[in-house]
Each structure stands twice: as structure tokens, then as C-alpha cells.
């Protein structure tokens, strides 16, 4: 608790710098995370205070981003990312599942293209000097202007503006996300020869391709009112294998926070999920309407999720 009071105190004590100057620092951080070449060890602390470590390397080669993240602890999972398209190699005993994901955004590249949208939903404060990964840094606090999102604490490298640490703090002053560089090295060249998986001939590789459907799939639902500051980022639909049923996923964002809404039919012999729970850094809220499961997931307050599921209207309602 004393730590949080201290963070709160330094957040407001650093207000001498103008707000426009502070937002300019965030712009510089966004550019640094995309344009610089760097590598290092990232530590992630979960809600049980367990630490998991990954090794990452990021290179901007001819204005294109290449990223590789390898797990150091546990199964040697691997993520390769080109621009915003990611491929995950997930070790599963005697086989490796290959999963694809579009529009991925991973630390330290966590900012939207324009920070103008962030200004609408967050106030910004200077949290003062710190030291992260043995480098001088400055903490910035992004505090929500309403009840629909959480607090973000960011530590930016003084020399390069690269984000070195991120903490997401909920309304109960609990840290729900905590990731930081343990060490950091800036690279002097744009070599991308490392951008490939190390294939294991002893294992079977399975591409987990979901049967994605086109945007022309008829939407039988609508969301009448979004929480303040959120807008649709992406939409996808897939058909269940062997079933004449379609599952929908819509992703919403305010620039920092993300919410996924899943809408899918519930078989007659299956009990739908309803109510609220928490899994890791994400809150989950589920409702059941007219034979369909509606579930919202995100690192945002539960009221934000419930406002979304409440406003999903099916065409037969």
C-alpha cells in the first residue's frame, strides 16, 4: 500500500511539465518501439507473483518490423512477428501447434498509431525518475477520465524513449499486469537472419488454421452503444468444423485497452456460461441470449464488459 501511495504522490508532484510535453514523450515512445533495433530479457509477473521470462529481439529492417520472442522458462514456445502478423509455435508434448494471429500488439510496442485518441480517455502525469534494467528512466501515469478503463504506469528510457516497463493497475489498486526489461541491448545492424524457427525433426508440426469466413457473413447481432472511447478494431467469423454454426469475434480498443466479444450458438445439450470471473489479467463477463453465448474478455473493469454484453442485440429480439 505504501508503494502505491508513493506512486500516487510522485504522479502528481511531477505536474510541472506541460501536458502537451508529456504526450510528446508518449509519441516518441511509440516511434522508438517501432523504429529501434534492440534485444533483451523480459520478465512478466503474474497475480501470484510468479515470474516468467522471455528473450526478445526486435529489428526494423527497411521500415518493416521483425520480432522474435522465445520462452526461457517452461516449454520452449516461440513467437515470430512481421509487422502486425504473428505466428506462434506452441510446444505440446510430441507435437508443435502453429497458430496465426493478425493485428497483434506486444510490449513494448503497445501504443496506437496516433496518441490523439489516448488524450480523449486518459490524463497524463509525470511520475518522476526511476531506474529500470540498469537504465535511467522516467515514469508516466496514464489515468482514466472515466470508469471504463484502468490505470497505466509506464517507464520510458531517458536516452531512447523506449518503454522499459508497464504496469496495469485496477480500481482496487491491484497490479494485474506487470512486464519489464531485465536487461536491454540496442543493436547496431538490421540483420534478420534469426527470423526463422528452429525446427525439431522429432516432432510433428500442425498448423492450427481456423476456418475464417469473409466479412460478408450476415451479422445477426448489433451493439447499440459502446463504452465511451472504445471503437471496433477487428471482426472475424469462423464456422465450427462439421457444424452449420458460426462463431463471431469482435475486438474493441480505446488505444491501450482491448476487449474481445465472442458470440456463438450454444448446443442444446450444453449449459451456457453466465456471470463474471477473472482469469489472469483479464476480467470475463458472460451472458446467454436467445440460444447464444455472449462473452466479453479484457483487462478493463467488469462494468465495461457488462455494458458491452448488455448492449448486444440479436436480430430476433
Language-model segments: what does each one mean?
Residues 56-109, 168-180:
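An acidic-aromatic
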Residues 35-39, 62-68, 134-141, 162-165, ...:
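Short, hydrophobic/aromatic-rich segments at coil-to-beta transitions
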